[in-house]
Amino acid sequence: MALWRSSDNLVYLPPTPVSKVISTDDYVTRTNIYYYAGSSRLLTVGHPHYSIPKSSGNKVDVPKVSAFQYRVFRVRLPDPNKFGLPDARIYNPEAERLVWACTGVEVGRGQPLGVGLSGHPLYNKLNDTENSNIAHAENGQDSRDNIAVDYKQTQLCILGCTPPMGEHWGKGTVCARTSSAAGDCPPLELMTTHIEDGDMVDTGYGAMDFAALQVNKSDVPLDICQSTCKYPDYLGMAADPYGDSMFFFLRREQLFARHFFNRAGVVGDKIPDSLYLKGNNGRETPGSAIYSPTPSGSMVTSEAQIFNKPYWLQQAQGHNNGICWANQVFLTVVDTTRSTNMSLCATTESQPLTTYDATKIKEYLRHGEEYDLQFIFQLCKVTLTPEIMAYLHTMNSALLEDWNFGLTLPPSTSLEDTYRFVTSSAITCQKDLAPTEKQDPYAKLNFWDVDLKDRFTLDLSQFPLGRKFLLQIGARRRSVVPSRKRRTTTTAPTPAKRKRSKK
């Protein structure tokens, strides 16, 4: 008897349609009005390796300022809808809203080129494995040494309207079914977080959480042994559907290994016996195979600088072509080619020293940085059609709130309770009440705030970046003061008429 049964093959249904992300060029109209804005000189000074607290209390007296930190500038722009425009007829406030588009940027860096050293007075160094004349040294209780290094060389610039994202390796979670003991290697997890001002860059030792993954505080130099070194998540920011975190980026990295050491300590993962043959004369047991180089960024030169030159944004790599949503720009800068650490000293005596005595002199370290940010912004307008408003609300609902637009919910048909005194202790806690003030989504993050709300100007020719921009677009400046020199007039002699000859 034949028995019919359905096919065992899986039936694949078509995927659900995904809303298409459109480029800002499709709904943002650009005008021919450009503004210049600059921050002037920005300075910061501190200790290059660690922050110094005050003698009384936990407040910081001298901050940590290192060339190997990220500088994340949060540049605040004026609201163009409340801006004094040269022509009020440029847009219709009832059906359009104005936004800024960043078309040019220049990051100015002061101070000379230099190489700054970092290190650790108790660095975990067992043997010099590059020029070793023995198989291994005795792995004593403490063999740490005073080692200094020059870090990896990095120049970086990221521009976007949201904070950049960084990645690093952190300590993961051990599964409950996995047995673990003290001293086992911790599991690793790739973590993605925002890059904040003051976060450490990758110095050549890897992007990782050293405080959680290196308990000896001696495997890396002082300035990162209790910090987290982050590396920009270029893959994640490039895959951002809206392209807000990274319009474009500039990057230059350089590194080589200067010295080769191995680590002191008990080797957690033993070398398999099949990988070596035992010997004599102290070579019965191999030494530590936990090798680690010291990085070096090598020579710094002005010919390889990405700063102090203009960059023009014609087409961003994502869907956001330079539109500064929420009237702000995030500029992330790293420059380790100006990492000079200044050595300062002062005498402990009230009178000037007549002879050198090191016990009467205090030595200090300081690092200073100098920046100058310049921008060219283009005035743009968005036509608020129902389709565009729905798209913007899906992308970022706060934009419509900033433009005094909101969604009106349909009236509820059910009976709801509304208390009068919502803060009274006599009634139940009103947890679902909406906050009265708008919350800053980045309030808990640390950035270098730069306010440019009163620094916009139409006189592009009066500023260095503005003149470079006018040269790019082919504009010619006309002289305001007329020339007093009288033009010389020349008269050409009138040619003599030829007489007709009679035939």
Swiss-Prot record:
Database matches in InterPro entries: Capsid_L1_Papillomavir, Capsid_L1_sf_Papillomavir, dsDNA_vir_gr_I_capsid
Coiled coil: none
One annotated GO biological process: endocytosis involved in viral entry into host cell
Domain of life: Viruses
The protein, known as: Major capsid protein L1
Gene3D superfamilies for the chain: Major capsid L1 (late) superfamily, Papillomavirus (2.60.175.20)
Keyword match Disulfide bond: yes
Task of the protein: Forms an icosahedral capsid with a T=7 symmetry and a 50 nm diameter. The capsid is composed of 72 pentamers linked to each other by disulfide bonds and associated with L2 proteins. Binds to heparan sulfate proteoglycans on cell surface of basal layer keratinocytes to provide initial virion attachment. This binding mediates a conformational change in the virus capsid that facilitates efficient infection. The virion enters the host cell via endocytosis. During virus trafficking, L1 protein dissociates from the viral DNA and the genomic DNA is released to the host nucleus.
Encoding gene per record: L1
Organism: Human papillomavirus 29
